[in-house]
């Protein structure tokens, strides 16, 4: 048996631990979580039907099943990646599928406070510059790269649309 020393994050006196990673994610600090994990924090789940509000606003989203695997970061809007593994079969990716596809995304985590009919916290990803893709029933990974902003309730649909458009620009810039 070899004795190992604690792993410390560069520039930090604190020992790297799952507690620290969970605290960072709860605060929406995906950059710290990435440094601690050595990879971007992510979730995996099946794309399910939502209220289709994103599509109505001009920003269609892939909604993750509420039982997705992984730790959900704090409420807010994030830049990240959606990795499509293809159609699910019994909750897992189907075998012998063609290549995996990776798309830049603006990701919303929260209960969409502008609207009162959102029953629970959601994770939904808008694929940047792609509108004609059907991901329903596909297994996807959502990787969180950078937090763009916190969740905000808007006074109507028009201010929300303007903000989402800005979020998409900022997400695109964060991912280049």
Predicted segments, located by residue:
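Classical nucleotidyltransferase
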Residues: 1-60, 151-164, 168
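Phosphate/ribose-recognition catalytic cores of enzymes acting on nucleotide-derived substrates
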Residues: 50-176
């Amino acid at each position: 048996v070899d004795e190992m020393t604690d792993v410390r994050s560069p520039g930090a006196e604190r020992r790297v631990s799952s507690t620290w990673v969970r605290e960072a994610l709860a605060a929406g600090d995906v950059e710290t979580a990435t440094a601690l994990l050595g990879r971007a924090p992510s979730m995996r789940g099946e794309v399910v039907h939502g209220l289709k509000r994103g599509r109505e606003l001009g920003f269609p989203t892939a909604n993750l099943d509420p039982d997705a695997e992984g730790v959900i970061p704090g409420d807010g809007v994030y830049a990240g990646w959606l990795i499509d593994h293809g159609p699910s079969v019994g909750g897992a990716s189907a075998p012998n599928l063609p290549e995996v596809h990776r798309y830049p995304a603006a990701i919303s985590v929260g209960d969409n406070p502008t609207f009162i009919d959102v029953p629970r916290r959601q994770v939904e990803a808008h694929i940047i510059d792609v509108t004609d893709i059907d991901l329903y029933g596909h297994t996807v990974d959502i990787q969180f790269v950078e937090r763009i902003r916190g969740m905000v309730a808007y006074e109507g649909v028009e201010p929300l649309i303007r903000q989402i458009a800005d979020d998409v620009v900022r997400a695109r810039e964060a991912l280049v």
